[in-house]
Regions:
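Short linear motifs at protein or domain termini
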Residues: 1-107, 114
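C-terminal effector-binding regulatory domain of bacterial HTH transcription factors
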Residues: 1-6, 207-226
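Short helix-capping and inter-helix turn/linker motifs at the boundaries of alpha-helical repeat units
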Residues: 11, 142, 186-190
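Conserved amphipathic alpha-helical segments that form helical-bundle/coiled-coil interaction surfaces
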Residues: 101-180, 191-197, 209-219
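Well-ordered alpha/beta subsegment
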Residues: 203-204
Length: 226
């Protein structure tokens, strides 16, 4: 009988990291709120403040919080943020960044739309419909771009692939400027029309139609950057 390996003991920092991650991911600490102070967390869990500080740094590396010196640790719950920062360093040129982001979306999103057509729930479809209605009525450029991004993020979530959803969110935030340029040049009506066609394909549970509608939408977006 082979010897049994001794159990791996987690460090106090890992324990604190697990507890804080659970509070954020379970929704007990909402996005935009501040974590309890280092002292409060250290007393609550009988840990040193150094251990709590290290756990906060690891949370920031994962995109779950942002450390704001002099203010506290703010919950951001954005796992895409570290990837986004890496891409910003790799692609310092705004124009090249926008072009490559649009190309990446064209490769990723049609398949996400096809998967979402199979997995979409009535609740998810209602949320997309509400988003379309809000976009049609919106007149502010920045809010229109935010609604556009939210529509695509929601489809990625419906597709059920967390890896691709995080990748898409990273790319979407980097390419936000291209959305604002497109909305400014063509108005909301064009984007809204594409979204309505995508939503119709999702509601019909038609993966091929959803893939095609998304592909046409993103080909137009890529063409806008030419």
């Amino acid at each position: 009988v082979p010897p049994t390996a001794p159990p791996v003991r987690s460090s106090p920092a890992d324990d604190a990291l697990r507890k804080l991650s659970a509070l954020i991911e379970d929704g007990a600490l909402a996005t935009g709120t501040l974590l309890p102070s280092e002292r409060q967390l250290a007393e609550r869990w009988s840990l040193s403040r150094v251990v709590v500080r290290e756990a906060a740094r690891k949370l920031e590396q994962r995109g779950l919080v942002t450390i704001r010196h002099g203010i506290g640790v703010e919950v951001t719950n954005n796992p895409a943020l570290p990837v986004q920062h890496t891409l910003e360093r790799l692609l310092p040129s705004d124009q090249e960044r926008l072009r490559q982001c649009a190309q990446a979306r064209l490769l990723i999103e049609p398949e996400l739309a096809a998967a979402a057509a199979v997995r979409a729930t009535p609740k998810g479809l209602r949320a997309l419909k509400a988003n379309c209605a809000a976009l049609a009525a919106e007149t502010d450029l920045a809010r229109s771009a935010a609604l556009d991004i939210a529509f695509h993020d929601a489809i990625a979530d419906l597709a059920g692939n967390k890896v691709l959803a995080v990748m898409l969110r990273s790319v979407a935030q980097l390419g936000r400027l291209s959305r604002e340029v497109t909305l400014q040049r063509f108005g909301v009506a064009r984007a809204h029309g594409y979204h309505v066609r995508i939503l119709a394909a999702l509601a019909a549970a038609d993966p091929a139609a959803a893939r095609k509608a998304m592909k046409l939408h993103l080909e137009a977006a890529l063409g806008d950057l030419a």
